[in-house]
Amino acid sequence: MPNEMPSIYPLGVVGSGQIARMIHSAAVKLGITPRLMAEDSGDSAALAAPGASFRHPDALSTFAELCEVVTFEHERIDLGMIEHMEAAGQIIRPGARTLRAALDKIHQRRVLTAKGFTFAPFAELRGPDDLLDFAGLFGFPAVIKSVRSGGQSDRGSWVVDNQNDALRVMAEQADRELMIEQFQPIVKELVVVVARRAGGNARCYPVAETTYADGACLEIRAPAAIGTRVKTEAMETARAIAGELDSVGVIAVEFFLTTGGLVVNEIAARPHNAGHLTLENAPTSQFENHVRAILDLPLGPTHALAKAAVTVNVIGGLDGVDPAEHLHEALAVEGASVHLYGKRPRPGRKLGHVTALGDDMEQARELARRAEAALMNRRL
């Protein structure tokens, strides 16, 4: 029967937010039927595809038995279970080695600094003595971070200007494992998205530049306004990190460009917000190349199609505006591509994004910002 669902799916995606939704769409484009493991029937991807509960302890391993390959859209996973599943012969992409580095920032830094990659000076933060020791060496301001990644929407970091600020954060976040690192004099925040197959074949997308406020990514621009030397260093470093961690699929490496040079900030072992503009600005989006990589299919080209591309995130405000109610106005902005995730609005929640291409960055930025403002019923 034409509508009969397969007994074994070629691809399983754990999570049902917007990244899973876009992975699902990329797979369907290639004629691949993915299976989603949903947290909630009202989640973004769950609205567009069948899913399964993942609230029971055995649900993940049961789900994986229905799929040839399993991938993840978020970091809220049990690493021990992943290792057990791999030992049982199930194919997880990326694998436990990559996921451990993405999930645990201390482990990530120890593994990669041992191989010569540059991070800010850091230390575990188990109590006041660790704080005093670190402050004695590096002073303030400093940055306190949650050791375990909470996913793309988790704030997870706090800039502290003095010892009292640091002790307050430690008390407020007492239920988390914490680390502290030296504050960096940031000139720009950069991201390189890399797609890598199991055999080591990898392709990088152009370096993107991001703008953050209050822990939320507001805007992404590509190509980043940096020199050739920095661009080459960032892409080579990201490719090398993907290889060192034996990553399969898409991995994103975030950098700080500081007054002293390029410093690795974080890695994300999944498609990244900074790569959303590849839906319009690359022959093969990060989502399609993620599907290709984890299924060991040839990677597609990753070069930019336009001289400038800008993505502006659509983030819920205190006024409760629903961007879906203003879609008509946003679509009237010619040259802007609107992506809404089907989420109910709430303050700080990412509800969608808008991407615009242009011959120069300001032209693309103006189009994207106009469409985002229209969605949020706001005048520029």
Residue ranges of predicted features:
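Short beta-strand/turn micro-motifs at beta-sheet edges
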Residues: A38, Y205-V207, V338-R344
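Active-site nucleotide/adenylate-binding loops and adjacent lid/helix of ATP-dependent enzymes
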Residues: A101-V191, A195-I241, E372
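Short, low-complexity Ser/Thr-rich regulatory SLiMs
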Residues: V194-A198, F255-T259, G342
